[in-house]
């Protein structure tokens, strides 16, 4: 089969030869009557070129329609690959890993949230002998129990993380800081001092007024 680019190159030469043959035949018919066979020959040759031109045009139109139909029926491997990627369903493991990464966006270097931290109560090695120590221990146990319940309510599906500090606890030597639970003692209120106010001479504005003072 003749390729399409070759058919496109044959169109213009065939059309040019057809027009030239028709013009030459008509010119010979008008000039002299004794050369009529030659004029008919050029007219016939122009008709042949015209037929060849129309045949080339028809073949070109047929090839274009055939290529368009082939492209519509089979878009090609690239189009099929794009369609497969668009309608591809991920594997169950990939979907689960993606959901877990979306639910936990924090990095590994960052500490866990406060709701997942549970501080266990300290082991009871020895019972305090004085009432202030027992009261402080009860307050600490109550605070740790409330924090543990808040952590369990905030994240039921996550395992608790123990972030208890290791090592001995630092105890303050100041007496005010040792007994935090004790009620502070209040200082007695001192009454204001008494002032002697004299209303004997209300119209006198002198600040040097005295009872035994006499004008000179």
Curated annotation (Swiss-Prot):
Annotated signal sequence range:
1-25
- A single cellular component GO annotation: membrane
Quaternary structure note: Interacts with isoform 2 of SLC4A1.
Annotated keywords: Membrane, Phosphoprotein, Signal, Transmembrane, Transmembrane helix
PANTHER family recorded: TRANSMEMBRANE PROTEIN 139
Name positions with the PTM Phosphoserine: 146, 155
For this protein, the record's InterPro entries field holds: TMEM139
Q: What does this protein do?
A: May be involved in cellular trafficking of proteins such as SLC4A1.
Which parts of the chain does the record assign to the membrane side Extracellular?
26-34
Q: Region labeled Disordered — which residues?
A: 104-163
Disulfide bridge partners, by residue number: none
Report which superkingdom the organism of origin falls in: Eukaryota
| Basic and acidic residues bias locations | 127-145
Query: What membrane topology does this protein have?
Result: Single-pass type I membrane protein
Can you say what this protein is called?
Transmembrane protein 139
Those parts of the protein on the Cytoplasmic side are 56-216
Q: Where in the cell is it found?
A: Membrane
Identify the species of origin.
Homo sapiens (Human)
- Which stretches are transmembrane? 35-55
- Specify whether Transmembrane is a keyword of the entry: yes
